[in-house]
Amino acid sequence: MLQRQVEPELMNATDQVEAYAAADFSQSDQALVEWIAQRFPMGLGDRVIDLGCGPGNIALLLVQRWQQIEVVGVDGAPKMLAVAKARGQALGSDQARRLSWQQSCLPDPTLPVGFTAAVSNSLLHHLHEPGVLWESIKQVAAPGCVVVIHDLRRPNSEEELQQLVERHAATAPPVLKRDYEASLRAAFSAKEVQQQLLQAQLPQLKVMEREDRYLTVWGQLA
């Protein structure tokens, strides 16, 4: 197994923000939302927090997929949030009014609480101390909160890493290709995440390896 190499926790450089805003992640983002819908056919309740929302990709899809929910997107990078806000305002008025945004870095004791669902896409690998994510989820969750944390998983070898970069980012702009490789190096293995959950006293959450590069943590709190 490759040794983990951390990367910067925030993505706020102008070239990064512009590249991620312009990139088309719609297929994988929509697939994640549909996976959530299949796993939780009763829905996500009425208040969802998207931790590390970036430019708002998942938050926007959530308010379109479930007509009754309100979503709070949280991110530490102000330039990413500016893109998310603009995208939200471009939606229809009903969907736009169910979106709100908060600039925050974890851990943050001032985060709103009482959420019926907590989701996150590609935040975990950015965190130098991953435990802050699991503690933050416990902090913001209402009883019975649905949890879905989706992220990359670290490859076993340098050879496997380079194969993934060429398979999934060969034609991407240089900044995205560079960041993708760095993210794979910073990601956790499924075994490491399982250990994190035990340390956080969240044994009810499951860890699933998906496709050739992802892991998803999912479940429902007591």
What residue ranges belong to the model's regions?
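Conserved alpha-helix/loop element of class I SAM-dependent methyltransferases that forms part
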Residues: 26-46
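Conserved beta-strand signature within the Rossmann-like core of class I S-adenosyl-L-methionine
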Residues: 145-151
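N-terminal, positively charged/glycine-rich alpha-helical extensions of SAM-dependent methyltransferases
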Residues: 1-18
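Conserved glycine-rich SAM-binding loop
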Residues: 54
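Class I SAM-dependent methyltransferase SAM/SAH-binding core
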Residues: 49, 57-108
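C-terminal alpha-helical "lid/dimerization" subdomain adjacent to the S-adenosyl-L-methionine
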Residues: 152-202, 206-208
